[in-house]
Amino acid sequence: MAELNPSAGHVEQYEVCVVGAGIAGLNALTVASGYLSRDQKVVLIDRRERVGGMWVDTYPYVRLHQPHPFFTAGNIKWTLGANPSHLATKNEVLDHFQHCLDVIKERVQLTTYFGAEFESHHESPGNVRITARSSDGRPLVIHAKRLIKANGFDIVPNDPLDISSDRVKSVSPDYCDMRGEAMRTSSGPVWVIGGGKTAMDTAHALITEYPGREVNLVAGPGTFFISRDRMFPNGTRQRWTGTLPSELFTELALRFDGTMRLRCRTGCARTIAPGSPRKPATSLPASCRNRRRQPLPPDCTRW
């Protein structure tokens, strides 16, 4: 049971408390439900207002770039009815997440607290006291036998770069739809900073929506681009063309020079090169304010 008043006398016990309602949290719930009976109680907490994790916040034109049947909780099947090669849209992924949650609710007694931010937990023999805060600021206290922190990478939306001016407008795909009116009424060149999935999806959306418009992409030296049609062809072509996964992973491994770079969101970083003495990750600058998980600097708040 969750109590809004921590001093309340009666507290109902949950078997499991799961923090995070994304793909990690849903898989944790699915596994836990396999060990519990229908009358046992489970509670789910997430800071977002619905199930879906990072997919709730991400840009509207995102696609799931993998066979969608494999992106699920446990062995819960999709109800989309599309070919396995179909690249699921944001809404289709969110609908499947909701379907997974509905299936789990048939297996156990599930209580959900969306819009609640996890704050801390305290363990005692046979019990975990979890403290969270609702979206309106009220304290939320939950007691459970087990706690599963399944918030994954705890990804937050990207803020625009701080470089806007009268002639340059900086936007973030997470807050500005590249297919929206603001972009449509402009005819200037577009510069996409980054070479990951977000950058490639954004460049693809711009090229598709505005044929002939100048689109530039700035990527770092470690960026590796592939052609999906050549690497993972669809239909009968996949029987005699494409690349074996073992060959792909071998090529990627050979491109790695052994250098590891740790970086937080404020930009502080540390590079570990081959042959260098091992140092703890807490040797990042003491001024770092961006911790998300250990091991990190004691004063780093957003990794």
Predicted regions and their residues:
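N-terminal Rossmann-like FAD-binding beta1-loop-alpha1 element of flavoenzymes
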Residues: 11-44, 191-209
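Short hydrophobic core segments
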Residues: 17-19, 140-155, 190-193, 302-303
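Feature captures the FAD/FMN-dependent oxidoreductase FAD-binding
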Residues: 83-156, 292-295
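Glycine-rich FAD pyrophosphate-binding loop
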Residues: 33-58, 213-226
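Conserved Rossmann-like nucleotide-cofactor binding loop
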Residues: 24, 50, 154, 198, ...
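Dinucleotide-binding/catalytic capping subdomain of oxidoreductase cores
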Residues: 207-303
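Glycine-rich dinucleotide-binding loop and its adjacent helix/turn
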Residues: 2-4, 83-84, 89-96, 151-216
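Conserved N-terminal glycine-rich FAD pyrophosphate-binding loop of Rossmann-like flavoproteins
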Residues: 49-74, 225-243
